[in-house]
Curated annotation (Swiss-Prot):
Designated name of the protein: Glyoxylate/hydroxypyruvate reductase B
Quaternary structure, from the entry: Homodimer.
Family statement: Belongs to the D-isomer specific 2-hydroxyacid dehydrogenase family. GhrB subfamily.
Entry annotated with the keyword Nucleus: no
UniProt source species: Enterobacter agglomerans
UniProt-listed HAMAP family: 2_Hacid_dh_C_GhrB (MF_01667)
Enzyme class: oxidoreductase
């Protein structure tokens, strides 16, 4: 008898066929607590936000069937990993295939924020380009400015490569430990958070959401940045205190922001961020290319096949459950 799999996102036909070869697949409508519980997977319920968890220890205890959860993402803050650990449920993600694409998105945010690409393009469409442009249309340079990277993982390293080699930008970074490859390849300079905030012309956030990183950038941290600085966030929205960021953008504490992630997603249509001309807001498109999303789905399928065969070798979030 084939193992049973719950499929909560559609897959390309060839990948769905591959799943069907190995498993009995049931498509479900999202990952609401009720839907997961109905199918015996309480331990993998999603979190509605960082602090309110669905599928805690008691809920996971109700689950007698779930053996593995495979997510099409690099982030896993939407899973209650502690509950999964308690039940011996393996969680696998897809961290490697999206690295270059997300770094591209971050560099696009750097450029579009600095050169006001979205803002001035809309002005052209509105018919405001009627004579030679003046300073009120100007942006700021990117090349040779200091890039500060908060979180030097795979994506941070790929961003450093683009900034250093493509734009001649000195690289500063802060992370849990020194990154020898970043320092040797891109002459990246490790510094403490206060120094990163004070000296960066572009502060690029590439951090996961954890108890330690929630609102890591708030009013106090934003006040330490240059008035000319631009904040880029393509990590997780709640790493930045959104209300503090709005205030800093309105009172010119910082120059601008390029955002691909938000505290609430989708971003509410009445969000004050959408009223600010110095904000570039994207709908969490960091990895959203046809090629990369296919690769992520392929890896998620491969991960699940390996996990249910007891052969997980990579991309395991909680390898301790395999021991």
């Amino acid at each position: 008898m084939k193992p049973e799999v719950l499929l909560y996102k559609s897959l390309p036909d060839d990948l769905r066929a591959r799943l069907d070869e190995h498993f009995t697949v049931t498509a479900i409508n999202g990952l609401s607590p009720e839907t997961i519980a109905e199918h015996g997977g309480a331990g993998a319920r999603r979190r509605h936000d960082r602090l309110q968890q669905h599928g805690g220890s008691s809920a996971a205890g109700e689950n007698a069937k779930l053996r593995a959860a495979s997510t099409i993402s690099v982030g896993y803050d939407n899973f209650d990993v502690e509950a999964l650990n308690q039940r011996g449920i393996v969680l696998i993600d897809t961290p490697t295939v999206l690295t270059e694409t997300v770094a591209d998105t971050m560099m696009a945010l750097v450029l579009s924020s600095a050169r006001r690409v979205v803002e001035v393009a809309e002005r052209v469409k509105a018919g405001e380009w009627r004579r030679s442009i003046g300073p009120d249309w100007f942006g700021i340079d990117v090349h040779h400015k200091k890039m500060g990277i908060l979180g030097m993982g795979r994506i941070g390293l790929a961003l450093a490569q683009r900034a250093h080699h493509g734009f001649g930008m000195p690289i500063l970074y802060n992370a849990r430990k020194h990154h020898e490859e970043a320092e040797s390849r891109f002459n990246a300079q490790y510094c403490d958070l206060d120094t990163l905030l004070r000296e960066s012309d572009f502060l690029c956030i590439s951090l996961p959401l954890t108890e330690q990183t929630h609102h890591m950038i708030g009013r106090e941290q934003l006040a330490k940045m240059k008035p000319s600085a631009i904040l880029i966030n393509a990590g997780r929205g709640p790493v930045v205190d959104e209300q503090a960021l709005i205030a800093a953008l309105k009172d010119k504490t910082i120059h601008a922001a390029g955002l691909d992630v938000f505290e609430q997603e989708p971003l509410p249509v009445d969000s004050e961020l959408l009223t600010l001309p110095n904000v570039v807001a994207l709908p969490h498109i960091g990895s959203a290319t046809h090629e990369t999303r296919y690769g992520m789905a392929r890896d998620a399928v491969d991960n699940l096949i390996a996990a249910l065969a007891g052969k997980v070798e990579k991309n395991c979030v909680n390898p301790q459950v395999l021991r």
